[in-house]
């Protein structure tokens, strides 16, 4: 049995004892950023790239850096060790801190760090990774800085609820011009003409370490090329395969979108990527 622990400003404590001020700007305005780090076999997966993502968001929203990357790495390792969690994820959140109500940056406030660790059963999704999932689409009405992991995630919340009400696994966002960006918490890719296609890594999509891993390591391992180019549903419906990728779903085949079949099912390339991903995780996070 693991311990239900959290970290607040460098101090680890039982979750039931943790508290954050109602005047915290993250609570009042969503004035903060976050990052999610997967944990395998008691080890953080791709921790340094995830911390680079976090600091990039911190810099873009102009929150002063209180902790170094090295300190945050130590906090992650300590939280895993003291909680006893072997497989799960760590959610890190940094806000601008507590201040009187007002939209402009406060002159006197100290950024607040909170970290939570939860246990996850990845076997729950294993059957879906073999059979594939169905997803739906919705209008992408998010702001123009999706590459910043801010706490303002109401569009994703509503889109994910829409998926739940439709008995779908997730929801794809589509811009006004018809181009597909990503899902609520994963990148979206398709296999077409023996290449992997995905939306350009720009301000319209979240930074995604799994996507980066596929582009830089996994795709080359199976002799595939990743093309970053925006595409629409007409393009997707002519693809051989489609899949989501992210820290939670890993590599998840998509077999239907809005009740329309993609290719002939899971396909041949996605299982190869899944095997390459599993091997990479086992090398990076070996069992202790």
Locate the predicted segments by residue.
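Short, acidic/charged, Gly/Pro-enriched secondary-structure junctions
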Residues: 73-101
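Helix-start/capping segments and mature chain N-termini
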Residues: 1-78, 102-288
């Amino acid at each position: 049995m693991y311990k239900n622990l959290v970290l607040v400003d460098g101090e680890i404590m039982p979750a039931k004892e943790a508290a954050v001020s109602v005047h915290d700007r993250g609570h009042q305005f969503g004035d903060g950023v976050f990052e999610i780090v997967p944990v395998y076999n008691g080890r953080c997966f791709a921790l340094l790239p995830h911390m680079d993502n976090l600091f990039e968001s911190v810099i873009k929203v102009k929150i002063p850096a209180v902790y170094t990357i090295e300190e945050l790495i130590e906090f992650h390792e300590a939280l895993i060790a003291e909680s006893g969690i072997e497989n799960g994820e760590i959610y890190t959140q940094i806000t601008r801190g507590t201040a009187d109500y007002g939209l402009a940056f406060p002159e006197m406030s100290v950024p607040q760090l909170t970290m939570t660790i939860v246990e996850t059963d990845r076997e729950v999704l294993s059957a879906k990774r073999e059979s594939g999932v169905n997803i739906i689409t919705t209008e992408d009405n998010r702001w123009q800085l999706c590459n910043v992991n801010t706490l303002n995630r109401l569009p994703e919340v509503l889109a994910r609820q829409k998926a739940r009400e439709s008995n779908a696994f997730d929801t794809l966002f589509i811009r006004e011009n018809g181009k597909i960006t990503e899902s609520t918490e994963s990148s979206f890719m398709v296999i077409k003409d023996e290449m992997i296609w995905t939306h350009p890594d720009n301000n319209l999509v979240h930074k995604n370490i799994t996507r980066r891993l596929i582009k830089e390591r996994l795709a080359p391992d199976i002799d595939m090329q990743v093309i970053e180019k925006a595409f629409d549903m007409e393009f997707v419906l002519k693809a051989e395969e489609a899949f989501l990728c992210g820290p939670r779903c890993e590599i998840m085949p998509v077999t239907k979108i809005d009740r329309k079949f993609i290719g002939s099912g899971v396909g041949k390339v996605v299982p190869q990527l899944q095997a390459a991903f599993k091997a990479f995780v086992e090398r990076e996070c070996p069992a202790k």
